[in-house]
Amino acid sequence: MKNTFSRLFGFGDKESEFELQDESHEEIDKKVYEEIQEIPIVNITPNRYQPRTVFDDARIDELALTIRTHGLIQPIVVRQYEDDKYEIIAGERRFRAATKLGWEKVPAIIKNLNDTETASVALIENLQREELTAIEEAVAYQKLIELHNLTQEALAQRLGKGQSTIANKLRLLKLPEEIKSALLEKSITERHARALIPLKNEELQLKVLQEIVEKQLNVKQTEERIAKLLEEAKPKRKAKQKAVSRDTRIAMNTIRQSLQMVTESGLNVNSEEEEFDEYYQITIKIPKKK
């Protein structure tokens, strides 16, 4: 059975994007599989492509307790990048738990992968666990798109997700760093963050973020607050139109009063007013003789 990475992110020609040819399958199997070895923990480094940036210490402690009781059932997966130097491909939480237990060595499977393959496996392995924050997931999608030169639609097909899911996650990356940090720290939810996107103005986004955290606003309250701000930001055209109409009335009344004063002085003045869509027209006839 072909492994998920080979099937979804193979490096063959376009006809084999989703499945590698049978001839190359055995080579891939030989390439990615080695027997389990005990590797000194001091010789192992975390994966530089690890999408997870926040590790819950309490959960690592729980995992360490489980490993102490039952042993490490699933070895970590690493690749060798220098003599006696290894990089984690999958299993960083297990590695951290083993470190907390004071282990000197940890069981590991060594796979011979290049940088692109290592990054892809690490990203996909974490995405499949569905334990990433929304921002970590978005970063993982972005890295896969860049590594394999994919469109959002192509990535969605390979991961079995809707394109809108990918697009919504990637939009989060355009938010200010403070909001992304709040998402990572789980101070706000993904829906809170997505509600902030229409504001556009970074200063306003951060102001609302502060309100969400300080007032513990739920998603509905946040959306209502943002809708109000967006409404307030709209040009007040109606008010402007009323101001223009008022000025026009003042002008018309001033002209009428002036004509009335001329008439009262004994001069017979004829005037005619016409109203059009865009303007008023006043025609005044003043006799040359009384």
UniProtKB/Swiss-Prot annotation:
Q: Which gene encodes it?
A: noc
Main function: Effects nucleoid occlusion by binding relatively nonspecifically to DNA and preventing the assembly of the division machinery in the vicinity of the nucleoid, especially under conditions that disturb the cell cycle. It helps to coordinate cell division and chromosome segregation by preventing the formation of the Z ring through the nucleoid, which would cause chromosome breakage.
Give the superkingdom in one word: Bacteria
Which compartments is it annotated to reside in? Cytoplasm, Nucleoid
Per UniProt, the keywords (alphabetical) are: Cell cycle, Cell division, Cytoplasm, DNA-binding, Septation
What HAMAP family does UniProt report for this protein, alphabetically? ParB_Noc
Q: Which family does it belong to?
A: Belongs to the ParB family.
Species, as recorded: Bacillus cereus (strain ATCC 14579 / DSM 31 / CCUG 7414 / JCM 2152 / NBRC 15305 / NCIMB 9373 / NCTC 2599 / NRRL B-3711)
Q: Does the keyword Cell membrane apply?
A: no
What the entry lists under InterPro entries is as follows: Chromosome_partition/occlusion, HTH_ParB/Spo0J, Nucleoid_occlusion_protein, ParB/RepB/Spo0J, ParB/Sulfiredoxin_dom, ParB/Sulfiredoxin_sf
GO MF annotations in UniProt: DNA binding
Q: What is the protein name given in its UniProt record?
A: Nucleoid occlusion protein
